[in-house]
Structure formats: structure tokens, C-alpha cells
């Protein structure tokens, strides 16, 4: 348990009906009682019951706000410490005054993520659950929310703990051999050890394989809209967004920079990037935009190539199609509300493997088909399910990869009939890397880095 008491605003700053100030630590309840004037006269407060009253400055007897206060006794609180929540009126002035009063009584401002960090240090949460808290708060799709809830409920922790228990059993077997070297070692025992390691590797590989899906859920799909100037790229972006965010004019080359927006497609965040039109230009600013477009195409997960179907295929169109042919791409034939002059056979000769969809961004026609095609490119047209265990964090992936390497090394040493000491070192290494994920063996630097990414008040 920590010895100091902290406080911070736990709800978003700004105007609102209610703001919640959280206070945690050994002096939280005593300090708040000194500034809280309750409607009750006896001064006794029951655990986890809400009380009406006023926050008053004892020195001036000035009322700062009318509030509701909840006193929560350790260890059954978020931080496992004594906690008080002050529900005051939303707005910067009352919140600021109440916090300043608390700080004047020796309570210090909470650091980013410190409430959740205390929950971790006091054993209420492991690191994966703590990360689940932040993902739940910042989730923009149902899929990420579901994954976050799974982590918060301890599903990943339980999986890692089971794997660590299995490795403890293997290490105990090896240590027994080391401690009693005179006993005969049956070859079958080595086979059994290898069998246990193989089973652990299957689980590790399944978790590693889930990262591709988890990364999509967390980071989204980088989708780049490309095409020559004035084919309707910005109109397409606005159609996907359902609102006008990009400039739409008849002037070619209007979009000279890269615009990025995020949409929710079947639970997957699609990071849509509208780029400058690709064409030869003497304009230095436009040239920079074109270069950024090429760079975006190189880094894209999906490329939407927009072609004006009311015009014949131009040399610039052909150049863009050639650039996109080796990428995961979708050909968007825009302006279908106009007479079609495009020769589809000519396109097929260039890039027959790129799927096509016809739309009219101006008339808002073809959006459903477009989304179906994008969905097909991303995950085979299926709605991504998140009930199964997936990892979404790069640090989890890298730790699991190290676990896999250590277990593979142990298998090689068993196969080569190396000493139990060497095999035990590999198993212990795998055990510790698993502990990094849950926080059991994580360094103080890693823990600080994780919680520094949190917001103040969380």
C-alpha cells in the first residue's frame, strides 16, 4: 500500500452536468470529511453509500459547491485503498476550486494512470487488465470494446497463468533431476517433457497468430484513396464518412495534402486517407502532395483506386493502376450517373486481378456495394468475431515471440540430450517472458511506461 493520498478529476474536463473527483489513499476519508458539510449531523458515513452536502472551505466558511460524496473502505475499492468520490457540478471552476482545496490539505495531484497503477501494485489488476481499462475507455468500435472487456475480466491473464503453471511443473521436474543426479533418467521422461513443451508452444503460437486480427481491431486498416485529380476522391471520402469533411470543387489538384479520417466498418476502424491527385505538375506544393501520395500507397493496407467512368482511361490512370496492381486494391469506378466512356476491357488487360465496384459519389449510390467489397478485402466479407482470445498489444506479441524462441531452444537442447541445467535456463526464460505480459516479472521502467500512457484521473 502507498503512504500518500492522491486526487484528480476522473471525468473529462469541461462543461457538464456532473464531474467526479476521485481521492485515494490512507488520508482520503479524513481529509474529505474536514471539507464536507453533510446534511447528516452525526458525521458518521456508511461504506459505499452516497451522501448529499456541500464542500466548504473551513478557513473562510465559503461554500464551493453542492455535492454528493461516496466513502469507500479498503480493500474493496478500485485501488484497494480508502477511496472517496466527490460528485460535483461539471465545469472548470468548481472542479478547480475543490481540487485546490484538497491539495492545500496535503493531498497531491495524481499522476497519469496512477489510480489504475495503484490497483496493479496492490494486486487488484494485472498489467493486461490495466491495459484493458485504457482500451475500454478509448475504444471507438464494438470489437475493441469487447476485446478490452475480455482482458479486463482476466481472460488473457488466466491463459498466461495456466501456461506459467505448466512451465513451473516442467522446471520442477528438471530441478529434481539436477538435485538427484544419481537416479536413472528414463528416455520416456524426456519425451514427456518435450510433449509438455510442445503443448505450451501450440498455445503460444495460437496467441501469436491472433495478433494479426488484434492489430486490425486496435489500429484499424490503413486505406488510401488514390486517383488522378478531379475523379471524385474527396467526394468518395465524404460519402464514406457520411459528412462533408474534404473540399470538393471542379478545380483539379484542390487536395494538395493528405487527409485522414476514421470510419467504423463492421466493427473495424478504417483509417481512410484522401491523397493528392497523381499527375505531372510544375507546382512545387502539388509535387510534395503527389510524393506523399506515393509514400501513402507504399504503407497502405488497402488502396482504393478511383477512376472517372465518364471519361476514357488516361495515361495517368494507367500509371496509377500499374502502381496499385501488386497491392491489395479495389477499383472504384465513379460518376456512374454520367454516360460511361470507360473501356473496361482496356482496364482488364492492365490489371484484371483488381476487383471493381461502380458508384456515384455525387448521387450517393453504390455505397453498400463499396463497403461489401472493402469488407471482402479486409476479412473475407465476414463480420469479425471477438469472443475468442486475441492479443492487440505489440508488447504482448514481442514477449510471446521470445517465449516461443526460449521453448524452441529448450526442445533443441532436449533433442541433443544436453544437461538439465541448460534446459532449465530456457524454461525459466520462457516463464519470465510470460510474466512480463501480466506484470509478474515486468521491470519498473516497463510498468511506468505503460501507465504514463494513461490519462490523469484513470
UniProtKB/Swiss-Prot annotation:
Cofactor note: Binds 1 potassium ion per subunit.
CDD domains referenced in this protein's UniProt entry, alphabetically: trmE (cd04164), TrmE_N (cd14858)
Residues engaged in binding GTP: 230-235, 249-255, 274-277
Domain TrmE-type G: 220-379
Cell division listed as a keyword: no
Molecular function GO labels: GTP binding; GTPase activity; metal ion binding
Key words, A-Z: Cytoplasm, GTP-binding, Hydrolase, Magnesium, Metal-binding, Nucleotide-binding, Potassium, tRNA processing
Subcellular location field: Cytoplasm
Binding residues for Mg(2+): 234, 255
Binding positions ((6S)-5-formyl-5,6,7,8-tetrahydrofolate): 22, 85, 124, 458
Domain of life: Bacteria
Pfam assignment, any one: TrmE_N
GO BP of this protein: tRNA methylation; tRNA wobble uridine modification
PROSITE patterns: G_TRME
GO cellular component terms attached to this protein's record: cytosol
Cofactor dependency: K(+)
UniProt binding sites for K(+): 230, 249, 251, 254
Function: Exhibits a very high intrinsic GTPase hydrolysis rate. Involved in the addition of a carboxymethylaminomethyl (cmnm) group at the wobble position (U34) of certain tRNAs, forming tRNA-cmnm(5)s(2)U34.
NCBIfam families: mnmE_trmE_thdF, PRK05291.1-3, small_GTP
Family: Belongs to the TRAFAC class TrmE-Era-EngA-EngB-Septin-like GTPase superfamily. TrmE GTPase family.
Subunit structure: Homodimer. Heterotetramer of two MnmE and two MnmG subunits.
Protein name: tRNA modification GTPase MnmE
Amino acid at each position: 500500500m502507498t503512504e500518500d493520498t492522491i486526487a484528480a478529476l476522473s471525468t473529462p474536463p469541461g462543461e457538464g452536468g456532473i464531474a467526479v473527483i476521485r481521492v485515494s489513499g490512507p488520508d482520503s476519508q479524513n481529509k474529505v470529511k474536514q471539507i464536507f458539510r453533510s446534511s447528516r449531523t452525526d458525521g458518521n458515513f456508511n461504506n459505499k453509500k452516497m451522501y448529499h452536502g456541500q464542500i466548504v472551505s473551513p478557513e473562510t466558511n465559503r461554500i464551493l459547491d453542492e455535492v454528493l460524496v461516496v466513502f469507500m473502505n479498503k480493500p474493496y475499492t478500485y485501488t484497494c485503498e480508502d477511496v472517496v468520490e466527490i460528485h460535483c457540478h461539471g465545469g472548470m471552476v468548481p472542479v478547480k476550486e475543490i481540487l485546490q482545496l484538497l491539495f492545500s490539505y496535503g493531498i497531491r495531484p495524481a499522476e497519469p494512470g496512477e489510480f489504475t497503477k495503484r490497483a496493479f501494485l496492490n494486486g487488484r489488476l494485472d498489467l493486461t487488465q490495466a491495459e484493458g481499462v485504457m482500451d475500454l475507455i478509448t475504444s471507438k468500435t464494438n470489437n475493441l470494446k469487447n476485446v478490452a472487456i475480455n482482458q479486463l475480466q482476466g481472460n488473457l491473464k488466466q491463459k498466461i497463468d495456466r501456461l506459467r503453471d505448466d512451465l513451473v511443473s516442467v522446471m520442477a521436474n528438471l530441478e529434481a533431476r539436477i538435485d538427484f543426479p544419481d537416479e536413472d533418467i528414463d528416455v520416456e521422461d524426456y519425451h514427456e517433457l518435450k510433449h509438455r513443451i510442445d503443448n505450451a508452444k501450440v498455445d503460444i503460437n495460437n496467441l501469436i497468430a491472433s495478433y494479426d486480427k488484434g492489430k486490425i481491431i486496435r489500429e484499424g486498416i490503413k486505406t488510401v484513396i488514390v486517383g488522378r485529380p478531379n475523379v471524385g476522391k474527396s467526394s468518395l471520402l465524404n460519402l464514406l464518412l457520411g459528412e462533408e469533411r474534404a473540399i470538393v470543387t471542379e478545380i483539379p489538384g484542390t487536395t494538395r495534402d493528405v487527409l485522414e479520417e476514421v470510419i467504423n466498418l463492421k466493427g473495424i476502424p478504417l483509417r481512410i486517407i484522401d491523397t493528392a491527385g497523381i499527375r505531372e505538375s510544375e507546382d512545387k506544393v502539388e509535387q510534395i502532395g503527389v510524393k506523399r501520395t506515393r509514400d501513402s500507397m507504399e504503407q497502405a493496407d488497402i488502396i482504393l483506386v478511383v477512376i472517372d467512368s465518364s471519361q476514357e482511361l488516361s495515361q495517368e490512370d494507367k500509371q496509377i493502376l500499374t502502381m496499385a496492381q501488386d497491392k491489395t486494391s479495389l477499383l472504384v469506378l465513379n460518376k456512374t450517373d454520367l454516360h460511361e466512356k470507360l473501356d473496361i476491357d482496356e482496364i482488364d488487360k492492365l490489371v484484371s486481378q483488381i476487383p471493381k465496384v461502380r458508384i456515384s459519389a455525387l448521387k450517393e449510390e453504390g455505397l453498400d456495394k463499396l463497403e461489401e467489397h472493402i469488407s471482402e478485402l479486409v476479412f473475407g466479407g465476414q463480420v469479425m468475431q471477438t469472443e475468442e482470445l486475441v492479443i492487440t498489444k505489440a508488447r504482448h506479441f514481442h514477449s510471446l515471440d521470445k517465449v516461443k524462441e526460449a521453448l524452441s531452444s529448450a526442445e533443441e537442447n532436449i533433442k541433443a540430450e544436453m544437461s538439465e541445467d541448460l534446459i532449465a535456463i530456457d524454461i525459466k526464460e520462457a516463464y519470465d517472458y510470460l510474466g512480463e505480459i501480466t506484470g509478474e516479472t515486468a521491470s519498473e521502467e516497463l510498468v511506468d511506461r505503460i501507465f504514463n500512457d494513461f490519462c490523469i484521473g484513470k
